């Protein structure tokens, strides 16, 4: 293990992925993140109290370059040693060794991250849906609750036979399957409507791209409709994803519709076989228009 591990203050990496806790799911997670079809393979740092559980790269080439911080991910020192401030994403896996109290450790870890790096993108695995309300007071960006996902996928598979195969295809990283990608709105489409951008992307037939939704940031509100603020008094922003925005309607008060004007910071979600390059194609169509 020592041959691919070094002191965390020697890592010197940025824009990396931090995986908190090492579980049975970690192996597949690493292999998906470092799949040959992934164009931008980010460095991975694992924070775990059991580094001996992480395979050595001599056993599996996928693990070459994996860096390890021995410690509890809910400890701020462990997070700092892993370079939390310069990380692209933090993935918090439920510590399966803690069984029913695994979500409690996850909450403690998110609070620690909120305190020292509130702007980092955080994805958490939650085991019990009853614990979801506790995350309303954190800056977590994405919550994966296996309990809810399993129930909903089972129900949808009954209502729409075969739908599970669609999800399996989209969630498998390879050159032969479609994946979901997120792209920033090209500068020359800022101020234009989602519908105008959709038509331009549809015209890029040679790239085999399907536009499925819009991503934007909005102020997070509580159950009473009040804007939530952090401990500095700043509004808490949350990412919203609108799949297939509807036509503008008087009966709907949503601002995200087909005629919504795109702003800086918005993103589009696309389905494609590989990471698409829409910038060049859209620039050509924009110039012609």
Predicted regions and their residues:
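Cytosolic regulatory regions of ion transport systems
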Residues: 1-289
């Amino acid at each position: 293990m020592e041959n691919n591990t070094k002191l965390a203050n020697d890592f010197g990496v940025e824009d990396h992925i931090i995986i908190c806790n090492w579980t049975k799911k970690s192996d597949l997670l690493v292999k998906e993140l470092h799949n040959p079809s992934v164009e931008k393979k980010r460095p991975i740092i694992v924070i775990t109290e059991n580094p001996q559980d992480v395979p050595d790269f001599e056993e599996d080439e996928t693990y070459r370059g994996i860096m390890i911080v021995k410690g509890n991910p809910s400890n701020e020192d462990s997070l700092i040693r892993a370079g939390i401030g310069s990380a692209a994403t933090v993935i918090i896996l439920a510590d399966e060794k803690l069984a029913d109290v695994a979500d409690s450790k996850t909450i403690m870890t998110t609070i620690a991250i909120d305190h020292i790096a509130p702007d980092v993108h955080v994805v958490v695995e939650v085991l019990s849906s009853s614990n979801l309300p506790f995350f309303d007071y954190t800056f977590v960006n994405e919550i994966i609750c296996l309990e809810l996902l399993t129930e909903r996928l089972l129900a949808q598979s009954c209502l729409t036979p075969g739908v599970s195969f669609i999800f399996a295809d989209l969630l498998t990283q390879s050159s032969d399957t479609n994946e979901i990608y997120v792209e920033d709105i090209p500068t020359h489409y800022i101020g234009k409507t989602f519908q105008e951008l959709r038509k331009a992307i549809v015209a890029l037939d040679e790239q085999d791209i399907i536009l499925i939704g819009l991503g934007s940031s909005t102020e997070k509100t509580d159950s009473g409709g009040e804007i939530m603020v952090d401990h500095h008094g700043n509004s808490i922003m949350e990412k919203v994803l609108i799949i297939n925005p509807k036509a503008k309607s008087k009966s709907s008060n949503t601002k995200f519709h087909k005629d919504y004007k795109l702003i800086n910071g918005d993103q589009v979600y696309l389905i494609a076989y590989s990471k698409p390059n829409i910038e060049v194609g859209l620039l050509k169509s924009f110039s012609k228009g």
